[in-house]
């Protein structure tokens, strides 16, 4: 009787834990006139199964992509980052692209989504790119 009660108690927890495993959030800040870029960027991020959240900030000729990798794949962050960077470099050779899995860059990119002043966004993207280069 105890085994059956424990089984009925724990089964819902396992089902709830598995139900939201495939959700992925992708947000994009796009102030350019290029309309197809948004769909392409969303597509590349969505195709990356290891990523559960992504933010892309596209201003002028700059593209900053911040990704959050699923926790159990944290040891593969660098490889995932390099693979996605290569995809964007091939797809957009005329853009300055930076892909990062660093949480601080993700957090700062998230703040940029709310920013209304485009010049401030451009300046912040430059600062974030410099910060990312310093960390490597």
Name the predicted role of every residue range.
Residues 27-48, 52:
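Post-signal peptide N-terminal segment of mature Sec-exported envelope proteins
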Residues 85, 89-136:
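C-terminal low-complexity, charged extensions that often adopt amphipathic alpha-helices
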Residues 1-4:
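Positively charged n-region of N-terminal signal peptides that target proteins for export
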Residues 19-22:
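Bacterial signal peptide processing site
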């Amino acid at each position: 009787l105890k085994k059956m009660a424990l089984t009925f108690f724990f089964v819902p927890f396992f089902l709830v834990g598995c139900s939201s495993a495939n959700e992925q959030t992708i947000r994009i800040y796009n102030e350019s006139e290029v309309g197809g870029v948004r769909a392409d960027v969303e597509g590349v991020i969505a195709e990356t199964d290891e990523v559960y959240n992504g933010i892309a900030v596209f201003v002028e000729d700059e593209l900053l992509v911040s990704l959050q990798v699923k926790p159990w794949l944290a040891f593969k962050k660098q490889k995932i980052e390099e693979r996605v960077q290569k995809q964007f470099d091939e797809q957009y050779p005329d853009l300055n692209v930076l892909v990062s899995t660093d949480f601080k860059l993700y957090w700062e990119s998230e703040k940029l989504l709310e920013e209304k002043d485009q010049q401030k966004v451009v300046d912040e993207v430059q600062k974030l790119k410099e910060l990312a280069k310093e960390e490597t």
